[in-house]
Amino acid sequence: MALSRIYSSKLASANKNLLPVITTYVRNASDSTDLKAVLSEKIPKEQERVKNFRKQFGATKVGEVTVDMMYGGMRGIKGLVCETSVLDPDEGIRFRGLSIPECQKVLPKAPGGAEPLPEGLFWLLITGDVPTKAQVDALSREWANRAALPSHVVTMLNNMPTTLHPMSQLSCAVTALNHESKYAKAYSEGVHKSKYWEYVYEDSMDLIAKLPVVAATIYRNTYRDGKGIGAIDPKKDWSANFTKMLGYEDEQFTELMRLYLTIHSDHEGGNVSAHTVHLVGSALSDPYLSFAAGMNGLAGPLHGLANQEVLVWLQKLRKELGDNASEDKVKDFIWKTLKSGQVVPGYGHAVLRKTDPRYTCQREFALKHLPNDPLFQLVSNIYKVVPPILTELGKVKNPWPNVDAHSGVLLQYYGLKEMNYYTVLFGVSRALGVLASLVWDRALGLPIERPKSMSTDGLMKAVGASK
């Protein structure tokens, strides 16, 4: 029986002429385990829906732009379309309308497992449907069958200096995979633009399948003296194969990776990595080049390095106060950090105004599997004392923890202690969201991105300011 689901979604507009409404949707998921065939049925309907929507409301304003927005990283400007996820300031991320707790409940799991399989989330992101277990199993097998790396990429990875940052190695390897791009080949042969999405889909599926192999090879070469990663097991899921290739056999760690790869997969379209993939893809660059560009953005300290900064700060606190520090001593350390002009890493978010649900689900995992771990207990104490202090300070819009306040602690517990590698894990996960979006970018025929820029003099003239 095809899976049916009814849910409500609040649709609001900044324009006063468009009143908020509650709409009820019924989603009938196909029984087919052929993901491309499922998409082939959905895409024409969505193309028609968007066409009609633009025809009727194309000239309708959805927001305003201030001078501060232009100088402030375009924060808050509504300028992108992203179908896969929406970030609610109060509820956190919703993947195709589903919150993280809802995804944990309805997405298929591994036998005996409690966390959702990332394959299921990818199916949800790219189709909008909650998949069946059979569909997820088929996707696991398909990715296993597509996972082999071409020999030139293996040679390249094995000849990179082990001192080269893992993210640089990832970017190089993904760029080199462009040699195998089915989309680039089809484009050069003059394929019709209505077929672009099919080849972007093929490249995206190949890339997602190969990323754990690339990432595991980087890990083994850089931190394990080049020990082989072994072969992909077609009977295992994507995360299980990844952890096995990394060299970890602990089933709890595999469960953690399933959770980690799910919750880091997507976060709307405006963050640096997602926007970069969309931007580069809008020039009709293939998925390999687009994703590599996104990974170069993710490698930046302000985007993908936050959980490392949290760990460094925690280790500093632990070294100074010890494992059993009292709440009062932790409070004193927090105040000392703030008074020195630094921030408390892992707290606050550009959009969220409550505790990040990605933090919450990791905390629940820790409470279940490692409640007595000293580093986790320290994180728990910090969770108690930091929000009231930041609230008292009065300068912070969001005093609550984000995803980065917790992820590094869990990885450390299970023995993956190489902090420079953490962003690679983030990148493997983020592929699920950004590549699902890239397929839809081409399916909807979105044009090359080309916003208008202005000089300071031009802005001053536009607003009537004196120079």
From Swiss-Prot:
This is Probable citrate synthase 1, mitochondrial. GO terms for cellular component: mitochondrial matrix. It catalyses: oxaloacetate + acetyl-CoA + H2O = citrate + CoA + H(+). It is found in: Mitochondrion matrix. Pfam families: Citrate_synt. PANTHER family: CITRATE SYNTHASE (PTHR11739), CITRATE SYNTHASE, MITOCHONDRIAL (PTHR11739:SF8). Citrate synthase is found in nearly all cells capable of oxidative metabolism. Homodimer. Pathway: Carbohydrate metabolism; tricarboxylic acid cycle; isocitrate from oxaloacetate: step 1/2.
